[in-house]
């Protein structure tokens, strides 16, 4: 799919954040229940839990499919800050979340594997992923050639 596909999704956002959060939490609960039930020896319980989880997951995927992904907790936090007018730094591990118009003029600290890199969101960043602005590797310059290097013949 690559970058072009992700760029095409930038205008297709999830309309209802509350429903999105509800389905997300419901799917997480169902998954935890499946993991918990797997330790029991009752095959019927395991099958019912897996079936229930699959139904919830299918509903969640249908709701989210072909839309820009934004971490629901991050989005809810930013939405609260927009309503109250706060401008605190928000820490997130979600590098795969797409920058949406609600994030503009906020500072989001994205984890690069070692530290949180603060990123001030501008309108030009909308449509890109948060991870693009927090590099995970540090570039150390190429080694200088020393006088000891001998040419091979």
From Swiss-Prot:
Keywords: Ribonucleoprotein, Ribosomal protein, RNA-binding, rRNA-binding. Residues 1-63 are annotated as: Unknown. InterPro entries: Ribosomal_uS19 (IPR002222), Ribosomal_uS19_bac-type (IPR005732), Ribosomal_uS19_CS (IPR020934), Ribosomal_uS19_SF (IPR023575). Pfam families: Ribosomal_S19. It comes from the Bacteria. One of its GO terms (biological process) is ribosomal small subunit assembly. HAMAP family: Ribosomal_uS19 (MF_00531). Protein S19 forms a complex with S13 that binds strongly to the 16S ribosomal RNA. Transmembrane segments: none annotated. The keyword RNA-binding applies. The lineage of its organism: Bacteria, Pseudomonadati, Aquificota, Aquificia, Aquificales. Belongs to the universal ribosomal protein uS19 family. One of its GO terms (cellular component) is small ribosomal subunit. Residues 64-153 are annotated as: Small ribosomal subunit protein uS19. This is Small ribosomal subunit protein uS19. Gene3D superfamilies: 30s Ribosomal Protein S19, Chain A. GO terms for molecular function: rRNA binding; structural constituent of ribosome. The keyword RNA-binding applies. The gene is rpsS. NCBIfam families: rpsS_bact (TIGR01050).
């Amino acid at each position: 799919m690559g970058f072009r596909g992700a760029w095409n999704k930038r205008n297709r956002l999830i309309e209802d954040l509350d429903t999105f959060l509800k389905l997300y939490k419901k799917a997480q609960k169902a998954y935890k229940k499946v993991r918990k039930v797997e330790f029991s020896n009752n095959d019927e319980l395991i099958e019912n839990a897996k079936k229930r989880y699959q139904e919830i997951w299918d509903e969640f995927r249908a709701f989210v499919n072909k839309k820009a992904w934004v971490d629901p907790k991050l989005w809810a936090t930013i939405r609260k800050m927009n309503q109250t007018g706060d401008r605190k730094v928000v820490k997130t591990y979600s590098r795969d979340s797409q920058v949406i118009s609600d994030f503009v003029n906020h500072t989001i600290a994205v984890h690069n594997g070692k530290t949180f890199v603060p990123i001030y969101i501008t309108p030009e960043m909308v449509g890109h992923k948060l991870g693009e602005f927090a590099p995970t590797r540090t570039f150390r310059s190429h080694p200088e050639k020393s006088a000891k290097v001998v040419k091979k013949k």
